[in-house]
Amino acid sequence: MMVERWDPDRDGPLSEAALRRKLERRGYRVSRYVYPVGTYFSDHSHDIDKIDAVLSGRFRMRMEGNEVILEAGDCLAVPRGIVHSAEVVGMEPVVSLDATKA
């Protein structure tokens, strides 16, 4: 799993608008979601390529036997058909941008 971290020197200050623009420039459609504390997504897959991007909170992702905790500014590519799970970690909701490409 390769996490792309926000780089303020390259990307500027982190904001929802800036992260959305970065993903849209790559050809993704972007939707915003808020996941409450305790949210858990069991193993599943998608029929499209996507990127999970975190604006705030902490999001544990498990994929192909690996685990990573995404934090503000982190992006993780989830290829179509790859089984993964996710859960909110800690006591803060996760604000996420879900970027999809057909």
PLM regions and their residue ranges:
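Structural motif
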Residues: R58-R60, E67, V83, P93
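A short, N-terminal "cap"/entry segment at the start of jelly-roll beta-barrel domains
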Residues: M1-R32
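Ligand-binding loop in jelly-roll beta-barrel domains
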Residues: R80-A102
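Short acidic-glycine-tyrosine-enriched beta hairpin
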Residues: G65-R80
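Short histidine-centered beta-strand/loop micro-motifs
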Residues: R20-K22, Y40-H46, M63, E87-V89
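Short, conserved beta-strand element in jelly-roll/cupin
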Residues: Y35, S45-M61
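Conserved short histidine dyad/triad with adjacent acidic residue
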Residues: R29-H46, R80
